[in-house]
From Swiss-Prot:
Database matches in SUPFAM superfamilies: Translational machinery components
Encoding gene, per UniProt annotation: rpsK
Entry protein name: Small ribosomal subunit protein uS11
Family recorded in the similarity comment: Belongs to the universal ribosomal protein uS11 family.
Function: Located on the platform of the 30S subunit, it bridges several disparate RNA helices of the 16S rRNA. Forms part of the Shine-Dalgarno cleft in the 70S ribosome.
InterPro entries reported for this sequence: Ribosomal_uS11, Ribosomal_uS11_bac-type, Ribosomal_uS11_CS, Ribosomal_uS11_sf
The keyword Transmembrane helix is assigned to this record: no
Amino acid sequence: MAKKIAAKKVTKKRVKKNVDRGQAHIQSSFNNTIVTLTDAEGNALSWASAGGLGFRGSRKSTPYAAQMAAETAAKAALVHGLKTVEVMVKGPGSGREAAIRALQACGIEVTSIKDVTPVPHNGCRPPKRRRV
């Protein structure tokens, strides 16, 4: 008679990092806005996107959706003790400024804003123009 041993589920304990300085990466495309808050080395502390918050279709690309994404990411990063960030903005989207303002409104001090949008030296052919 073999006894059944209950298998204990092994769960990895979430480590609460204590980070006061970090980076905010805002990727704002024409369709969506993704906000990632990292430590100084670039390891992600928290992230949020407009689509992940339930915004769908054309509402996903609005400045309000970007603001909500930035607030959600900031609240999650404040748990880790994040106080000041350098902002890196990438892309041509409409949620760039709204996301930066939302980070400041949540109590995170913005020390610098950098535009890191990749600009081709005439690389790939762009998509054809829309005709509506």
